[in-house]
Amino acid sequence: MYIDITHYLTVSALMFTIGIAGIFLNRKNVIIILMSIELILLSVNLNFVAFSAFLHDLVGQIFALFVLTVAAAEAAIGLAILVVFFRNRGSIAVEDVNVMKG
């Protein structure tokens, strides 16, 4: 069986849909929202790599590496902010994020 570009695009669209659904269906847990954003970025990277392989061009794969680098930095900074927020407030609920001390 030959796996062509439609299989990759179908998996990518499914991953993107699951990521969007994770954001909209669970608005209370910040960690799940961050994981959903990472899933969306991973599906975009799969699109870049699939089109890059289909068109025999390396630009999509190089761009996917840049997106992975930015996603890793975003995850590290987001988790660091969550750790500091949890130490100060004792909770990571989204409802507690908008309550700020002046």
UniProtKB/Swiss-Prot annotation:
Mode of membrane association: Multi-pass membrane protein
Transmembrane segments: 5-25, 31-51, 66-86
Reaction catalysis annotation: a quinone + NADH + 5 H(+)(in) = a quinol + NAD(+) + 4 H(+)(out)
Record-linked Pfam families: Oxidored_q2
Gene3D superfamilies found in the cross-reference section: 1.10.287.3510
GO cellular component entries: NADH dehydrogenase complex; plasma membrane
Locations listed in the record: Cell inner membrane
Annotated keywords: Cell inner membrane, Cell membrane, Membrane, NAD, Quinone, Translocase, Transmembrane, Transmembrane helix, Transport, Ubiquinone
Gene Ontology MF terms in the entry: NADH:ubiquinone reductase (non-electrogenic) activity; quinone binding
Keyword Repeat in record: no
UniProt-listed GO biological process terms: ATP synthesis coupled electron transport
EC number(s) stated in the UniProt entry for this protein: 7.1.1.-
HAMAP family: NDH1_NuoK (MF_01456)
Function: NDH-1 shuttles electrons from NADH, via FMN and iron-sulfur (Fe-S) centers, to quinones in the respiratory chain. The immediate electron acceptor for the enzyme in this species is believed to be ubiquinone. Couples the redox reaction to proton translocation (for every two electrons transferred, four hydrogen ions are translocated across the cytoplasmic membrane), and thus conserves the redox energy in a proton gradient.
Family, per entry: Belongs to the complex I subunit 4L family.
Subunit annotation: NDH-1 is composed of 14 different subunits. Subunits NuoA, H, J, K, L, M, N constitute the membrane sector of the complex.
PANTHER family registered for this protein in UniProt: NADH DEHYDROGENASE SUBUNIT 4L-RELATED, NADH-UBIQUINONE OXIDOREDUCTASE SUBUNIT ND4L
Protein name, as recorded: NADH-quinone oxidoreductase subunit K
Organism of provenance: Bartonella grahamii (strain as4aup)
The gene coding this protein: nuoK
